[in-house]
Amino acid sequence: DPEMSRGLGDVYKRQVLHTDSWREITRFIISGSRKVRICRKTAETEVTVTLNLNGEGCCSIKTGLSFFDHMLEQIARHAGVDLEIGVRGDLKVDEHHTVEDTAIVLGECFAKALGSKKGIERYGFALPMDDAKAEVLLDFGGRTWLEWGVTLKREYVGDFPTEMARHFFASFCQSGQCNLHISAQGENTHHILEAVFKAFARAVRQAIRQTGGGIPSSKGCLA
């Protein structure tokens, strides 16, 4: 009915869920929306991240650093979350601010989307890729800490400075309120980094999964 349609206006702006997936509808009814959007603008960068923990691995990533985009895509696909990231950074100065601020906003999105963390697994871990082996232990328990046991032989992979990998995860830990232990070894630096990001994504996938109804802590809260 065209007249009714005009009266309702733009329905898409009002609805909280738009999907033809029964699986996603079921998850939404049980857990509610776990989708957030955060924008952060400084004199150095402008970062916008949209994260849906109840997603299906869809992503659109544009940071200005091709290899970094490739790594962030691994997070979306292997964690099974929908992720949109748009970054305008001062790359003419350095890659540091772009990588750091992306990690900060991504971590904030996870912290906000998880909310009280009711019903989640909380913990996650994972592993390998070709010659490289990576292990990531993750706890979304609210305590921030990073243990980094990764040796990278090359200074750059593509347009990405490898020293920023550790800084990315350190920044994510702080804003995402999580504990990360990452270790990896191998011959090819590209493979090592990709194994780390994929293992991280698989750990995230396990940790954010909702399997119960209570807070996964004897304290009764996670903060």
Over which residues does each language-model region extend?
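Single conserved hydrophobic/aromatic residue that forms the stacking wall/gate
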Residues: 1-12
